[in-house]
Structures are given as C-alpha cells and as structure tokens.
Amino acid sequence: MSDDHAYQAISAYDQRLIQTPNIDRIANEGILFSNASVTNSICAPSRAVILTGKHSHLNGKIDNGKPFDTTQVTFPQLFQKAGYQTAMFGKLHFGNNPKGVDDFLILPGQGSYINPKFIGKKKDTIIQGYVTDIITDVTLNWLDKKRDKTKPFMMMYLHKAPHRPWWPSPEKFAEYYEKEFPEPETLFDDYQGRGSASKTAEMNILTHMQYMHDSKIRPETLESMGQVQPEIKYIRGESVVRPGPNGFMGP
C-alpha cells in the first residue's frame, strides 16, 4: 500500500507522464481495477476502513489524532486465526500497535523519510537510511529468512511515500528534468511564476511513485525465492491528495 497517490501516477492507468512497469506487470498478468470508491481519504481513517471493512463512523477512527479502537476486528486477525503467518511493515498511523500480526515493524505516526524510527514487536529502533529502502529491505528479509515456509502467509507492505513532504532521493529527482508536463488552464490565474514551481512539485510526486513503489519489490523477486507463491498480490493507494485550481490541494 502506498500513501497519497492518484491513479494517474501508475502508467497502467495513464502513460502520459510516468512509467511504472513493475506495477503494470501485476495489472497485466492479474486484474486492473477500473472502478473504485473512497470511503475516507485521510491517512489513518482510510487505513482503518481498509483493515476493518467498516466505514469510519462504525470503526471509530475519524481523524489522525485519536488512537484506533483495538476492540475492532481487523482482517489480519482473521488470517492469523485461520492459521496464516502474518506480518506488517511500514506505515500504519493508528497510534497503537497492530493486532493480529506475528511480526511487525511500523513507523510512529507519519514517520520520517531519513533515518526513521520504527516501533517493533520486541523493541523500538532507529535505522539509518531512506525510509522506502528500509521498509523494502525489512520486508524482503522477512520473506526470505524469517517466514515460516510451512505456513501460508499474509504480509502487509506499507509505504510512507509519496506522502508530503515529497522527498525522493536526489539522484532520482533528475530523471524528470527534461520531461514536459501539461499545465492546467487555471495555472496562472492568481500569481506569476507558478509554472516552474508546479512543474517541480509534479516531478517530485512522479519520482516518488516511480522510485519508491515501482522500483522496489519486483514480481521476479518473489519468483526467485521459489517457494514464495502468494495467492493474491494486491497493490493500492491508501488515499490521495489532489492538486486543484488556484493553488488548492485536498483529499
């Protein structure tokens, strides 16, 4: 799961600005969803809806500040009860630890892009590096070395990116310097010079999507592990921030 990206940031849906071949492969070899609804487009409430299958007024998570009600049943608990080995790595943003997972390493709240702190099942730790790379490495290590290969598994791989502040690796940002981005009709309505600023921001967002998600766990990585044959690989966005006219942005 990624954070705050729109469907246009995946080239399986829109090829004008960005290429995400690894995500596209999942779409091409599986199912590409063309119809969707958003029950809540705020970070933690959206995740609560996804994990519980209940609307926000039923699961009680209506904002990012109030802790999640841990008496609510989440789908990892159901997998765990059914005999699956369960794990969760990345951003949860619930204000408390997840239930129904055998192993977890999650960011506190929103987390940091650089040298982030993590909350673990046994202890908290600070890991040096870039958060997207760290979450990916932890996930791959669990798949390869910590997973009980005699059991089916359910693993949640949850990225912080591309949530603001949009902070890609510097070497990746340059990939979009020469790309032309279409400008909306209202771009220059209010103040001069917005073109270059808007273009820079969009390059930043698209770089987040390509580098932080498409270039991470490739389908062939799972295949190379041989015994890893997940029945379902599911990628989705948790919520989206949409640029609007006259400088406004919102869910």
Annotated model-derived regions:
Residues 1-251:
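Formylglycine-dependent sulfatase
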